[in-house]
Amino acid sequence: TRKAFNKIKFVVEQNVNVVSTAEEMSFPMAQEPELSAEMDKLAKEHGVSILGTGINPGLMMDLLAICLSGCMTDVEKVTCRRVNSLSPFGPAVMEEQGVGLSVNDFNTGVENGTLAGHVGFAESVGMIARALGWNIDKFEQQMSAIVTSVDRKSPYGYAKAGDVAGVNMTGQGYVDGEVKIDMVHPQQIEPEMEGTHTGDYIVLEGSPEVNMSVRPEVDGGIGTIAMVVNMIPHVINARPGLKTMLDLP
């Protein structure tokens, strides 16, 4: 959000609506409440709207769970799991996810912050919590290596046996000291080579329990393009201000 702010500000000052794919923009108030308020004020002054969206965050691990909760009288816990393949992605993603690194180099990258892993858990947790009326008192996330036992090669990535084929991201949102939102997101190149099948899964504990399974995964690249394009008319027709997927049809 902070890195994207100046670009968004420039566009808004030209009286143009903005749809951003920056992950943190999906629910920027989760980590940047003051900057979010500034963007909202700026958008209203110029009569335009700002929205951040994508496939994840933006749909598969947040909005979809929120929509599914609409058939429930009581929600006790939300678990979202997205198992996806990194194979279609290019060199930048391979580097961000640590594909091809030794385990030691991967762990060093996690410690010094040079590996991005998945970005957006804080925003997804914040969006779900806002929709369900929960107050998150603690958020945590973890990042661990997925080590391959066979050589794996994708168009832009290579990991030899014993090295890192991807990253397993996990995150938790706590309410009153209890994990109420659980996020699990393993992503790797050529997952099928070791029997891992991609998919999107949501479990909502409560009354009645909801268990959703989509296999294979919803394609991240095409899905993000579709989300952005499909939201354009809604952003154009929205009242001015900073919006999230909770605000729009």
What are these regions (language model features)?
Residues 3-5, 9, 13-14, 22-49:
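Rossmann-fold NAD(P)-binding glycine/threonine-rich loop
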Residues 16, 22-26, 55-56, 83:
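Short, ordered loop/turn segments at secondary-structure junctions
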Residues 40, 44, 48, 69-73, ...:
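Generic secondary-structure signature for well-ordered alpha-helical cores
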Residues 53-58, 220:
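Active-site nucleophile and cofactor-binding loops and adjacent substrate-binding regions
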Residues 59-71:
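Alpha-helical support elements that line or immediately flank enzyme active sites
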Residues 69-200, 218, 225, 230:
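Active-site-lining helix/loop region of Rossmann-like oxidoreductase modules
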Residues 189-249:
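C-terminal helical cap and adjacent loop that interface with cofactors, partners, or active-site loops
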